[in-house]
Amino acid sequence: MTKAKTAPRTAPLVEPEEELILPETWRRRPWIPITILVAVLAAVLGAGFAMDKALQPVVPSQLAGCKTSTQVGPHEFVGLQPICIKPDKSYTATLYTTQGNITIKLHPEYAPVTVNNFVVLAVNGYFNGLTFWDAPDWEIQGGDPLGNGRGGPGYTLPEEKTNGLLWNPGSVGMARIPGGPVNGSQFFITKLPWPGPGPTAVYNYFGEVTGGLLDHVAAITPGDRINTVTITVS
């Protein structure tokens, strides 16, 4: 049996590339395309700057003087944040996340050092862009610059006990490893009541979610991000 021969392939004709022809006006005035390019670049950079400013936390005048302790590295400081909050004021934090906004009423009457620490970090942009690295059934956890549960601001917080308070859905506290100190920046928000009989260690209860926004908390999954945090004072 003779195999049929395949007809030899013919290379496709390739049309020569058309010469780029500039408009007559541009040929006479070569600076015009350069001017247009500069204008486009300026618009792009301007949009990026505007976006960056939009992600910056809005700082109320009462907190304009809230500065961090000496910074020794990215997301790292020498120690606790200087006291900035006032005992006669009320503070609310709004977390603008990839799943919607979460409003938290802060409780300095229960944990003044913790609330002050959170406020100072927030108004100085510490939490901007950080992810919620953990989100099991009953809570979500964020505030870790490393995004793996091992990070922090370079210092820890003292225990601030709140005897008798119930950890209901929407409660906000500070994370800690078993047997270790209270983390300086990692916080959690409960989606359900604390499992079992309640916590066996101090987790510095310092706030609660308000405004019926627990659906946004429940929607958070690992990898969701805090875009920015704003603090309001009343």
How should these model regions be labeled?
Residues M1-S234:
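Cyclophilin-like peptidyl-prolyl cis-trans isomerases
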